[in-house]
Amino acid sequence: MPTKKWEDEESSSGSSDESSPAVAVSVPRRKFDDEEANDSDVLDSWDAAEDSEVEREKAKKAAEAKAKAEAEAKANKKTKAARINEHKQRRKEAEESDESDDETESQRRERLRRTEKEADLAHAEDLFGDIGVPAGRKVKAASTSVSIDPSDPSKTVELSDMPIFNPKTKTQFEDMRQALIPLITASSGRKPHYNNFMEEFVRQLCADMPSENIKKISSKLTALSNEKMKQEKAAAGTKKTKAAKTKTSLVANRAGVTDTNSYEDTFGDDDFM
């Protein structure tokens, strides 16, 4: 082939190459087995991370719900002492409402002062508890539960839950009095500590009452004491009268008997022949 023809062909092929740009064909690279395994591990770790995050969120919500439920239950649950205090407060309010019509002005002031003092003490106890209170002066709340089985302390009876110990009307108070008096006074004369018991019992019963009411009770006790003294004096006088009559009759009988053992008596001369 002539040299010129070769040059023409080269020039034409060069021009054609310049006119048509080369298209890059992407050939997918084949992955190796270890690369595919790494990719699957990464996906599994992502899924596990998402699952653990969901589990943590669920556990957190469950813990919050449980804590909230426990807090509500604790707030709603009342202790035995709280129930007793509420019971006493309701009974006290009922008593005050019943006695409000009969009380005098001084009694009303005394009741209001006592109620305010008790409220202040309760508020201070809620704020400070037992801080600053010596152990010897700590006042223990009286328990109204009574054990019915000495061998089992858990078997108790709550007296404040019984209707008879929660009187509100005059009739209910009379029923409680009639139920308590036979129990307290049964065989009282044979109990050596009964007098001390009654002194302290009456004092504690009247401790929260107004002074005017205590004076009325004291007057009735004084009248009862005077009546008992009269009865005791009358009984003692009857015994003395019986003893005196018995002694007089014995002396009179002895005076009419001649004493044959006495030789000091002198007889008149007229007694002889």
Curated annotation (Swiss-Prot):
The protein's matches in InterPro entries, at most eight in alphabetical order, are given as:
eIF3-like_dom_sf, eIF3j
- Bias (Acidic residues) ranges: 34-54, 95-104
Q: Which GO terms describe its cellular component?
A: eukaryotic 43S preinitiation complex; eukaryotic 48S preinitiation complex; eukaryotic translation initiation factor 3 complex
Alphabetized GO MF terms: translation initiation factor activity
Against Pfam families, the record matches this protein to: eIF3_subunit
On the tree of life, the source organism's domain of life is Eukaryota
Q: Which residues form a coiled coil?
A: 50-97
Output compositional bias ranges, type Basic and acidic residues: 55-75, 105-126
Q: Where is it mainly found?
A: cytoplasm
What subcellular compartments does it reside in?
Answer: Cytoplasm
Q: Where is this region: Disordered?
A: 1-158
Instruction: Tell me the keywords, alphabetical order.
Output: Coiled coil, Cytoplasm, Initiation factor, Protein biosynthesis
Q: Name one GO biological process term.
A: formation of cytoplasmic translation initiation complex
Function text: Component of the eukaryotic translation initiation factor 3 (eIF-3) complex, which is involved in protein synthesis of a specialized repertoire of mRNAs and, together with other initiation factors, stimulates binding of mRNA and methionyl-tRNAi to the 40S ribosome. The eIF-3 complex specifically targets and initiates translation of a subset of mRNAs involved in cell proliferation.
* PANTHER family xref list: EUKARYOTIC TRANSLATION INITIATION FACTOR 3 SUBUNIT J
Q: Describe the protein's quaternary organization and the partners it interacts with.
A: Component of the eukaryotic translation initiation factor 3 (eIF-3) complex.
Q: Which family does it belong to?
A: Belongs to the eIF-3 subunit J family.
- What's the name of the protein? Eukaryotic translation initiation factor 3 subunit J
Q: Which organism is it from?
A: Pyricularia oryzae (strain 70-15 / ATCC MYA-4617 / FGSC 8958)
Give the lineage. Answer: Eukaryota, Fungi, Dikarya, Ascomycota, Pezizomycotina
> Its encoding gene is what?
HCR1
